Regions:
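Active-site mouth loops of central-metabolism enzymes
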Residues: 33-46, 69, 92-104, 130, ...
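Metal-associated gating/positioning segment near the N- to mid-region
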Residues: 22-89
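Divalent metal-coordination and catalytic microenvironments
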Residues: 2, 23, 34, 55, ...
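Short catalytic-loop micro-motif centered on adjacent basic/acidic residues
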Residues: 65, 95-98, 205-210
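Histidine/acidic residue-rich metal-binding segments in metalloenzymes
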Residues: 106-122, 127-244
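Histidine-rich, glycine-flanked metal-binding segment
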Residues: 1-28
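Alpha-helix termination/capping residues and helix-transition junctions
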Residues: 57, 88-91, 113-115, 203
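Short, acidic/polar
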Residues: 44-52, 102-112, 194
Length: 244
């Protein structure tokens, strides 16, 4: 059934196909918990079929997809539609994050916990209505979400201040080289620390995506993940493309 049946130095029994993997690493299929497959609404960039195929080429056999598409996945109806799309288009295992907004707490409360992967909260700028910057909305989200809360953490006020500062300084010469100055350590830390504080306040399950600073690491406890309610991750490319 297109699955690995046995890994061994010697295979005596009959097999449909035997692959010699001498000198290679054999690892389980990878799970990517944060992908942007752009379907529906933004398929000129990619879609569920093309991107899941690309993932398989790199060993990713399961994915959790983001809600910042068009229309946004901020309702249970739109979430169900994405699952229907994937049932005929995904080439690997799949799930989808429900997206939070400042106003969709009732949708969050009634989500099927056996369907959605997690609740994605953009605490920094995002597509459409998906920036969650209202503290009362954040309180409700961390208090009532039946799903693990996963966050993109940047303090939008600080980012806007930095944008104005560096635009006044560089004008039209402002470029990607200044990205880390605009979305700086302080903007990330302010938001990540707020998320951690809210998770502790409401005893929520929290996972913070793509940490980018040593300072943020101080918010999390070292050691094995077992039993932890507050966790985080980093992106490998951030380890290489930085100022060090």
């Amino acid at each position: 059934n297109n699955r690995i049946e046995l890994i061994s130095n010697s295979i005596d029994q009959e097999s449909k196909e035997i692959i010699d993997i001498d000198g290679r690493f054999v690892i389980p299929g990878l799970i990517d918990d944060q992908v942007h497959f752009r379907e529906p609404g933004l398929t000129h960039k990619g879609d569920i079929a093309t991107e899941s195929k690309a993932g398989l080429a790199g060993g990713v056999t399961s994915f959790f997809e983001m809600p910042n598409v068009n229309p946004t996945t901020t309702t249970n109806e739109n979430l169900s539609k994405k699952f229907q799309l994937a049932s005929t288009r995904a080439l690997s295992n799949y799930s989808f994050h429900l997206g939070a907004s400042n106003t969709n707490i009732e949708e969050i409360k009634k989500v099927d916990i056996n369907q959605a992967a997690a609740l994605k909260v953009f605490m920094g700028a995002s597509f459409g209505e998906m920036l969650v910057d209202d503290i009362d909305a954040l309180d409700d989200i961390f208090n009532y979400s039946p799903l693990i809360v996963v966050t993109h953490c940047e303090d939008q006020k600080k980012v806007k201040e930095n944008e104005e500062l560096y635009f006044n300084k560089y004008g039209e010469d402002l470029s990607a080289q200044h990205h880390h100055l605009i979305r700086d350590v302080d903007s990330c830390y302010l938001s990540s620390s707020l998320a951690v504080d809210l998770a502790k306040k409401y005893d929520s399950d929290l996972h913070v995506f793509h940490l980018t600073s040593e300072k943020e690491m101080e918010l999390f406890t070292a050691g094995k993940i077992d039993g932890k309610k507050i966790t985080a991750e980093v992106c490998v490319h951030h380890m290489y493309f930085n100022e060090s």
